[in-house]
């Protein structure tokens, strides 16, 4: 029997976790781009007003300035991409589709309509994996986390004041806050200040009485016939309306005035029967608005609007028309002010206006008068400490939303289209109407410019992290609070970065970078999804009357506020009823106990709190959060290895992570394998009976230089001897060999791996002929990207093993100190690991050369290069390109190329000789592509592109060659390794296998870790993993222990017993060098270790002669610049402390930047002269020149008083300047 599969049974300890409910992990990206493009809508006229369609509709129609013509938009059409994604990567082009739009130009005088399909530029489109390919590089547009538009109320603890802020999606900000004088001030764009009541009056509430009645209740109090007690209660109250003397028309008491004893007697004299007084909330006198009314100084609508206009536009004439237009422009015009659908939704839910039908109306996305009035009312109530009025928590996820790919691109296009609109209007006025067509009027340059700028250089369009499948997946699920319109790293405080209770199930509390971006770059939790408004939702099971339902509901953070949530591990009986009378629940930031009747929802799974990366850490519940953070981040840096191996102890998330990352090839439809080889898999589909070919990607370079290679994961059963098929059933196929022996092939190997016979009884089969093909299932998805049926994984990608994520290898570990070689997290490894390529990986580098057309002639790719030995050409073909399979070292030629040299004026005789004999060496120089320093390997692929063969190349490029060099990297001393629990270290020594500590059965351990790395780090998960890993190895099964729902200590001990291992996993080890027993028993087991992308080969660097900085003449810094070491000021202090003057002088002059001195010392070494006179360092000359820039001249004199020339030139300035001479420091 021939099969490529090693089938291991799996034991899952999870009692609650159901991974089938997980949404597709890159659904965020795909859904957002589908929303933007609406490519699924068959009829383009039926597209919804969103994304790209909304951009067109907002920009059109465009009227000419003199109103004689108008340009209208019909619909847009998307073409087909010119190349497939892989071709785009190879040719450094973008994966994009041509965008065309049907545009009509209507001439108003004649009614003539000119319609054209106008090309609007190329629009990059998303690949199936949620990425974009821009100029050959795969990029990801990261979702941005920003403050949601809407109205926010905040409390300033320092000033003890409340404020309100209206934040639109686009337009002017409106703020209300208290000033120092106790007046409620409105601010527009943080510049113009005026009393808040002025704005309220300008919206139609003209008089003080109208304003007061709008915000306060009132009650009538008797004066006539009232007893003294009642009259006393009237003192201190405020009138809500003006009290006017009916006979004279005089205002006796203004609205809002306090009533005192004198007022009462005047009112009694006037025979006023009763007065209307203000009813303040909670009965507290709060004169905020009354102070405002006194300050605003107007008492009717017209005056209010005019005063508002004068404040906003001082110097302009304030007519009622101008003033109303200005107010409309600021807050009530869809052109200049847009709350967005989200802003309107937030305002409606804040003030409980329920009018969802009006959401889509454009007018509804501007402010309404009611919104401003309600904002002021809410603020007044907050100041009055009224019940059920609270300030907003700015860090709550109900107030922060996600801007995904589609929205980010749409915002960029809006900018481009606004520039196009300006160009169109200019062209409409310049050209004659008869000659104009849509094509001539529209300039697409602004559109292509914003698209290229966004994808090429925006902070949110990032070069995809492709180190391994997990890095790829996490990058697409990342949330970034930085970027345009977001926070800035320097100004973000502690509160924004901190974990908030509303993050539960929405954003991972663990996965975030260490360093300045901590808490600003986050990851979505595993079950989270983004709703239509951009708010993150998380799923819960519904609880009705204390019974848990099967129904699942997704809630946003602000909807969750009002409910009590039970934990997913609360005990429930078969009927779905809670077994306890009091249940631990979550409510806002608190954890109260509640009866089952009070609970409305229950968590779906313990896993929903954390992100995919964190969900891959087994026994996470036993790890400290800081170490779990490191573990999550380091898994993304694991290099794909030569031989992948799934972990013995996983979490059950490995299969889904590998599946959704898109590195594996998955069957689209049900069928049976009909052929498998290294280049592809062929499936005969059940329905169509067609044979479908799935090609494999072989040895491609990723963005990070790791190797992307796919290997078949399905197989066929073949006969070894051939013969006649004697029996075919569902269970097995029997073949009778020519000798009469029977060869049996079992078809049902496991639940997952089953075969279907491809031969019939009585059929003759040859040696090695296939008798059965593996049964394949096609994938099926639900509406929200959740998997209904997983497709069979036909081929494994990098870091995957049988469809499971496999980032590292299981190795036998002993936790013990060993001769100090594992001091401070260092790691001791066995030579077997290197010999058997356990941690070897393949890395691929791409080298590129372009032959251009220069002023002096064309560069040529050729083998004919002057002044080189034959040895240099040994691996080049006849056209000068290296052969595939050649071993290359630093300095070797990969592609030979010559460039024409500039010729000096030659004598006529020389030219004549030159034309007769044609000396090639004189006219060209060698500009070949050579292997750079520090690189070596094997050439695995060559790609050639030329204009002659019709390839599209950049301007001026005639030919381009790419050479791919692969290199096998074994584990070396200095390489960084890590486990999944933040237990990282550097390989300190590779030891002979026979010298490693060995167990009683003679098997040496693979790796020795320091036990002191565990207690202080508090990551005990690695101890449980090691112990259970040993049991898994012995029993031949793989364990899955989901986070917060995994194996208990008892479970681990039970499986250790079954495997015949001690419960504490401690063993007697022997010293490999002496054979003696170690005094104490040692904790051993199998741990999953990763090799990280911090390889010592990429970091080690030595410089002989290299580049110098032009100004200071000191070596450059860093490996990339081939730099050298710098003797900095601290090193100088160290030498000064020892008084090592000669050493210091030597280091600061001839060994550094004394240009003449360093040339002389070379000569002295060659001639064997031991004394050398130092000169002046170049950095001193820099200092002198800087002082000269301050019009100071420095002259240096030697011991005999003679001037030392420090400058190579004397300019006019230095001859005529005033000389400042000094010999001693005092003179200065």
Swiss-Prot record:
Catalytic activity: RNA(n) + a ribonucleoside 5'-triphosphate = RNA(n+1) + diphosphate
Disulfide bonds: none
Native source organism of the sequence: Leptospira biflexa serovar Patoc (strain Patoc 1 / Ames)
Keyword Iron part of the UniProt annotation: no
Phylogenetic lineage: Bacteria, Pseudomonadati, Spirochaetota, Spirochaetia, Leptospirales
GO annotations of cellular component type: DNA-directed RNA polymerase complex
Top-tier EC class: transferase
Family per record: Belongs to the RNA polymerase beta chain family.
Pfam families xref list: RNA_pol_Rpb2_1 (PF04563), RNA_pol_Rpb2_2 (PF04561), RNA_pol_Rpb2_3 (PF04565), RNA_pol_Rpb2_45 (PF10385), RNA_pol_Rpb2_6 (PF00562), RNA_pol_Rpb2_7 (PF04560)
Key word Transferase present: yes
EC number, as in UniProt: 2.7.7.6
Function: DNA-dependent RNA polymerase catalyzes the transcription of DNA into RNA using the four ribonucleoside triphosphates as substrates.
InterPro entries on file: DNA-dir_RNA_pol_bsu_external_1, DNA-dir_RNA_pol_su2, DNA-dir_RNAP_su2_dom, DNA-dir_RNAP_su2_hyb_sf, RNA_pol_bsu_bac, RNA_pol_bsu_CS, RNA_pol_bsu_protrusion, RNA_pol_Rpb2_2
Subunit architecture: The RNAP catalytic core consists of 2 alpha, 1 beta, 1 beta' and 1 omega subunit. When a sigma factor is associated with the core the holoenzyme is formed, which can initiate transcription.
Protein name according to UniProt: DNA-directed RNA polymerase subunit beta
A Gene Ontology molecular function term of the record: DNA binding
Primary gene name: rpoB
Signal peptide per UniProt: none
GO BP: DNA-templated transcription
Keywords of the record: DNA-directed RNA polymerase, Nucleotidyltransferase, Transcription, Transferase
